[in-house]
UniProtKB/Swiss-Prot annotation:
UniProt superkingdom: Bacteria
Species classification: Bacteria, Thermotogati, Deinococcota, Deinococci, Thermales
Name of the protein described by the UniProt record: Aminomethyltransferase
Reactions catalysed, as given in the entry: N(6)-[(R)-S(8)-aminomethyldihydrolipoyl]-L-lysyl-[protein] + (6S)-5,6,7,8-tetrahydrofolate = N(6)-[(R)-dihydrolipoyl]-L-lysyl-[protein] + (6R)-5,10-methylene-5,6,7,8-tetrahydrofolate + NH4(+)
Keywords, in A-Z order: Aminotransferase, Transferase
GO BP annotation list: glycine decarboxylation via glycine cleavage system
EC number: 2.1.2.10
Organism whose genome encodes this protein: Thermus thermophilus (strain ATCC BAA-163 / DSM 7039 / HB27)
Pfam families on file: GCV_T (PF01571), GCV_T_C (PF08669)
GO molecular function, one term: transaminase activity
Cellular compartments per GO CC: cytosol; glycine cleavage complex
Length: 349
């Protein structure tokens, strides 16, 4: 089991540790709901050092990324970032990623922890036709996420740059608590916030400085409930190797006007199901629970849980394209009425 550079700090702060993607990570410190609401109302800090980081460099870096990713990497100016996906040749999704342009011929790609080896092998195979260098920088990169409406105010007291000039999806160098870092105004919670890329030896002093300044340590439980309220996908749940992204709420990522791996297969597929948001009248939905309409199964929950803001069970679910509802979710043998909800479940910042 791998440990992040913050493992000892988590234990000192009383974290309950769990295995996630081969890493020992904090599930929670106090309570998931408490940590969730701290991020929605103030500011929380997450250790996301398990995420993978690849550096893409070379004169054909952009051409390679245009082929390997579904979004238009050509629109990225230096110092900007975008959400994207790695399509496979069948029109499915190898992974969903964040891509940062660090220089004219240098990019940083952040991938999901469980997919690091798979993604690297996939990209290395694609890179053979391009003058490009791929480096797995995951082991020498620690990553913190500072999220919440008070994130900017808290972080401003610890950095040497004016954060008020930075927009969503900006990426820039800075010193945080005296340590060199790369900051990005990005996140996975639906709140404003920053992600901090650091050398492993700088992670603990920066993390503790953020906590001392008032950021509440938050674990994987709150990270998942926050992204669920925000209607964000989790790879392996809403997105898989078999998912056509054009049949999801994230179809906007796919730029059909450019060439990319699997484009023809993706465009040729008819959508047989659609992803919906559901708010239950009672009970807590979980992955795999059946969605019913008129007593018949018409879909399945891909992510579910309790929404601390709505104080209800909420779910992301795939239902048959023609299914109209009203819907119910089968919770422990009981058909619980579930109202369709637009996504996100809560307003994004």
């Amino acid at each position: 089991m791998k440990k992040t550079p913050l493992y000892e700090a988590h234990l000192r702060l009383g974290a309950r540790m769990v295995d996630f993607a081969g890493y020992l990570l904090p599930l929670q410190y106090t309570s998931i709901v408490e940590e969730h609401l701290a991020v929605r109302r103030a500011v929380g800090v997450f250790d996301v050092s398990h995420m993978g980081e690849f550096l893409v460099r070379g004169e054909e870096a952009l051409a390679f990324l245009q082929w390997a990713t579904a979004n238009d990497a050509g629109k990225l100016k230096v110092g900007r970032a975008q959400y994207s996906m790695l399509p496979n040749e069948r029109g499915g999704v190898v992974d969903d990623i964040y891509l940062y342009r660090l220089g004219e011929e240098e990019y940083l790609m952040v991938v999901n922890a469980a997919n690091i080896a798979k993604d690297l092998a996939h990209l290395q195979a694609l890179a053979k036709g391009f003058r490009v260098e791929l480096e797995d920088a995951s082991e020498r990169t620690a990553l913190l996420a500072l999220q919440g409406p008070k994130a900017q105010a808290l972080l401003q007291g610890l950095v040497d740059v004016d954060l008020s000039t930075k927009r969503k999806n900006d990426v820039f160098p800075a010193r945080v608590a005296g340590r060199p870092a790369r900051l990005a105004r990005t996140g996975y919670t639906g709140e404003d916030g920053f992600e901090l890329f650091l050398a492993p030896e700088d992670a603990e002093p920066v993390f503790l400085a953020l906590v001392e300044a008032g950021a509440k340590p938050a674990g994987l439980g709150a990270r998942d409930s926050l992204r669920l309220e925000a209607g964000f996908p989790l790879y392996g749940h809403e997105l898989t190797e078999e998912t056509n992204p054009l049949c999801t709420p994230w179809a906007w990522v796919v730029k059909k006007e450019k060439a990319f791996l699997g484009k023809e297969a993706m465009l040729a597929q008819a959508c047989r199901e659609r992803l919906v948001g559901l708010v239950l009248e009672g009970g807590i939905p979980r992955e795999g629970y059946r969605v019913l309409s008129g007593g018949c199964p018409v879909g399945r929950v891909t992510s579910g849980g309790y929404s601390p803001l709505l104080q209800r069970g909420i779910a992301l679910a795939y239902v048959e394209e023609g299914a109209e509802g009203p819907f119910q979710v089968e919770v422990r043998g009981r058909a619980v009425p579930a109202a369709l909800s637009p996504l996100p479940f809560v307003p994004l910042k």
